[in-house]
């Protein structure tokens, strides 16, 4: 039973037939636009015409709205005292005064300065990181450049070995130059001529036969 009662209590409230008394008072003063201020009677008449209100019951709430409006500064009492007299809209309703705007402007300036400082710090950090990366890359390039000449020096001895290979062929050339030695043997052939001379000398024996 208690749960059912709670559910019944949670039903949405009916919307009010009119706005709050303070809102109706402000609407009445803005609509009347009287230079000398709007009287309490004129405000009540405007509310009675434009809103579905029991003006007798609402009169007390209208008086309270006028008094609280003057205390808060939303309304200015031009004439009279309390809830009687004439009323105008206060400066707070029309807009913030210069004294109130100054702190807001100062706060905005501080926030803007903080944002700028944060951006500058981030930019400085990013620049420092970029410079470090650039320095590392430059150091790597220099180490690579130093290592390259060492590789060239290692290749040079191989070229010298290739140059020494023709020196091994020189002994073959000497052998080819030594081949003319058999030509000397051919030059010794005049010995055969000597044998022919000996054969030519044989007729001397014939001379002995003649004797």
From Swiss-Prot:
Job description of the protein: Histones H1 are necessary for the condensation of nucleosome chains into higher-order structures.
Organism of origin: Strongylocentrotus purpuratus
CDD domains, sorted: H15
Domain H15: start-end pairs: 17-91
GO CC annotations on file: nucleosome; nucleus
Basic and acidic residues composition-biased segments: 95-107, 114-123
Assigned protein family: Belongs to the histone H1/H5 family.
Subcellular location: Nucleus; Chromosome
Region named Disordered: 1-22, 81-211
Entry keyword set: Chromosome, DNA-binding, Nucleus
Record bears the keyword Nucleus: yes
Any one GO molecular function term: nucleosomal DNA binding
Coiled coil: none
One GO process term, biological-process aspect: nucleosome assembly
Basic residues bias (residue ranges): 124-177, 185-211
Main location: nucleus
Top-level taxon of origin: Eukaryota
Protein name stated in the entry: Histone H1-beta, late embryonic
């Amino acid at each position: 039973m208690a749960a059912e009662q709670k559910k019944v209590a949670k039903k949405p409230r009916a919307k009010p037939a009119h706005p709050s008394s303070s809102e109706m008072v402000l609407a009445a003063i803005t609509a009347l636009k009287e230079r000398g201020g709007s009287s309490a009677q004129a405000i009540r008449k405007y509310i009675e015409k434009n809103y579905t209100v029991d003006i007798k019951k609402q009169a007390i709430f209208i008086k309270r709205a006028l008094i609280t409006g003057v205390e808060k500064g939303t309304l200015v009492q031009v004439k009279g005292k309390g809830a009687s007299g004439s009323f105008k809209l206060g400066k707070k309703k029309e807009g913030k005064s210069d004294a109130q705007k100054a702190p807001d402007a100062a706060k905005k300036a501080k926030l803007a300065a903080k944002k700028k400082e944060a951006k500058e710090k981030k930019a400085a950090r990013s620049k420092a990181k970029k410079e470090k990366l650039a320095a590392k890359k430059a150091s790597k390039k220099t180490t690579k450049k130093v290592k390259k000449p060492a590789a060239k020096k290692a290749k040079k001895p191989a070229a010298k070995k290739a140059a020494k290979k023709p020196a091994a062929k020189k002994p073959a050339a000497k052998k080819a130059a030594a081949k003319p030695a058999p030509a000397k043997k051919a030059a010794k052939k005049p010995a055969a001529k000597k044998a022919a001379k000996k054969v030519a000398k044989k007729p001397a024996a014939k001379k002995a036969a003649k004797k």
